Swiss-Prot record:
SUPFAM superfamilies: Leucine zipper domain. Residues 67-83 have a biased composition (Low complexity). This is Cyclic AMP-responsive element-binding protein 3-like protein 3-A. Residues 67-104, 381-428 are annotated as: Disordered. One of its GO terms (molecular function) is DNA-binding transcription factor activity, RNA polymerase II-specific. Glycans are attached at N389.
Length: 428
């Protein structure tokens, strides 16, 4: 460290000698990036002498005694929380974004009081670049791997120059060495994968990738859990609705079954009622028909027999009513008697005494007497009984009536005629 402190002034003089715009050796070289081009790169096979390279770094580091405690910066944003100083001036800002990353470049600006140089170094490995030696010449340095500092992060000249301020150094140190807090899920996943992470920042790129991977898995797991939870809630809702619908469906089916049974019973009762109505309507019709037929038959059979074949008499004295006369058989009998009397003539008195009188003869006498009484009445004065009826004494005639038509037939017996057979008339 004493060697570094002794050579601090020589390093500043060396930088002035190299980068002075008026008298500097590299004043004609384009050290910045213009038109998207970097400063020229020499042949990588030209090796820089080891002594000159060591002197160059000793001169750069000699301006500060706190090299080991200088803050480190991460060149790119990450989850470790390391970022560049937000209060840096636009003069100290890095080149435009169009430049290729990880390429070494130098931006030089000179002021009256101080010289700020933004010259990032990648100690993971040098590729190409200009490195001045103590003699003031320019030599090309090829890949010259250097020993990596204890922190494992690249250092810049800006960090080295600003590290002399105690407040800035404390602030950067506080930001750099923050504690890494891991959740239980992150610790469990790290243990499952067999990886470990330090408890404090900064983290390497590999560790940052591991941390990002673990956190991404945790986010995916939480998202999957939320999705499964929502899906489960949705399925539970559907199941509850399906259960309610099933219960309602069973209730409706039960009601339908009851209605079907009621309908079947009503149909059976309707059929029975129809059968009863049909049977009841047929029986009266048949009974009525039979009764009518029987009545008609009895009427047709018994009507002719309702009037008896008996003698009718006058109910009152002086009334006239038709009466029944002798039948055909009796008429023939009387005719035979008349003919027999003609063959053996004798007096009527003797005949009356000898022969018995039939009931018909008595009836005829009664009729004759009745007609005589009618003739005596004043309303029948013009009635001539002689023209209608003749007694046996006068003309020896008999009045006979037809039993079917009721007409009276007149038979006249004339003893003067020589005919043996007496003519008679029949109105049948």
């Amino acid at each position: 460290m004493e060697n570094y402190s002794d050579q601090g002034g020589d390093g500043i003089e060396l930088l002035d000698l190299l980068f002075d715009k008026n008298d500097g050796i590299l004043r004609y070289e384009n050290m910045g990036q213009q038109n998207n081009q970097l400063w020229p790169v020499q042949d990588p096979h030209m090796m820089m002498p080891p002594q000159g390279n060591e002197d160059f770094f000793n001169a750069l580091i000699g301006g500060s005694d706190s090299v080991s405690g200088s803050p480190v910066w991460s060149p790119s944003p990450s989850d470790s929380g390391i970022s560049e100083d937000p209060h840096s001036d636009h003069i100290d800002s890095p080149p435009p974004n169009a430049s290729p990353p990880m390429e070494p470049h130098i931006v030089v600006s000179q002021t009256q009081h101080s010289l700020n140089i933004n010259f990032p170094f990648d100690f993971n490995g040098w590729e190409t670049g200009f490195l001045p030696d103590q003699a003031g010449g320019t030599q090309c340095a090829s890949e010259t791997p250097q020993a990596q500092p204890a922190t494992g992060f690249p250092l810049t000249v800006k960090d080295l120059l600003l590290s002399g301020t105690p407040e800035t150094a404390a602030k950067v140190s506080q930001q750099s060495y923050q504690e890494l807090i891991l959740t239980e899920d992150e610790k469990r996943l790290l243990a499952k994968e067999g990886m470990t992470l330090p408890n404090q920042f900064p983290l390497t790129k590999y560790e940052e990738r591991i941390l990002k991977k673990i956190r991404r898995k945790i986010r995916n797991k939480q998202s999957a859990q939320e999705s499964r939870k929502k899906k489960k809630e949705y399925i539970d809702g559907l199941e509850s609705r399906m259960a309610a619908c099933s219960a309602h469906n069973h209730e409706l089916q039960r009601k339908v079954f009851q209605l079907e049974k009621c309908n079947i019973s009503l149909m059976e009762q309707l059929r029975r009622l129809q059968a009863l109505v049909m049977n009841g309507s047929n029986k009266p019709v048949q009974a009525g028909t039979c009764v009518l037929v029987l009545l008609l038959s009895f009427t047709l059979i018994l009507l002719p027999n309702l009037k008896p074949f008996t003698d009718t008499k006058v109910s009152q004295h002086g009334d006239f009513s038709p009466m029944r006369v002798q039948s055909r058989s009796l008429h023939n009998l009387q005719s035979s008697r008349v003919l027999r009397n003609l063959d053996h003539p004798y007096s009527m008195t003797e005949n009356a005494k000898i022969l018995p009188r039939f009931p018909e003869d008595k009836t005829m006498e009664e009729i004759a007497s009745l007609l005589g009484r009618l003739h005596r009445r004043p309303q029948f004065t013009e009635y001539d009984p002689e023209s209608h009826n003749h007694s046996f004494d006068q003309h020896d005639e008999h009045h006979h009536g037809d039993p079917i038509t009721g007409h009276v037939a007149t038979v006249t017996l004339n003893p003067r005629r020589g005919s043996r057979r007496s003519p008679h008339a029949d109105d049948m």
